[in-house]
């Protein structure tokens, strides 16, 4: 029986016309082929309300064995699987629904740990020739809210991965809006990110197999 992996990326936001996470997920889906793995993919809204709601709907609709949510982060030059989601939201800019919330997300604990083997994900991405490192900061924007929803709305293996906010032929504006480390640039391409996500999907599937 194949392992079904749900992977999501995000739509553009903050004045950008692209989002590296959504682009990478779409490229991965076009080329992914494995008889032992079923890949379900989606691009979800950059919305504190709509992002988590869409993820929960996808989980209910597809009944995945594993959930991997992906977002982009300005200022990062490596693929960074996140260690935990925090119970906090701080919107430096409005989301795509013009919402700018602040405060706790839910009544749960301050931190919820990823239910994926983060060290194994890092090793798999590096083995594919892409720089990777673990991260202790999923931010306080919609990425963290969706990560939190994956952990609270799904009982199985679930986690979140940030990819660098790369663009084709220009610089992402999102970095300055959401990440204090925005000046850092990455030489990675969308195809490189798809390669990294391929490795992550395969490594994550061992958690749900």
Regions found by a protein language model. Name each.
Residues 1-140, 151-155, 183-209:
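N-terminal catalytic or cofactor-binding beta/alpha core of small enzyme domains
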Residues 15, 167-173:
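Short active-site-adjacent structural elements
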Residues 138-168:
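Active-site oxyanion/phosphate-handling segment shared across diverse enzymes
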Residues 174-184:
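A solvent-exposed, charged loop/short amphipathic helix patch at secondary-structure junctions
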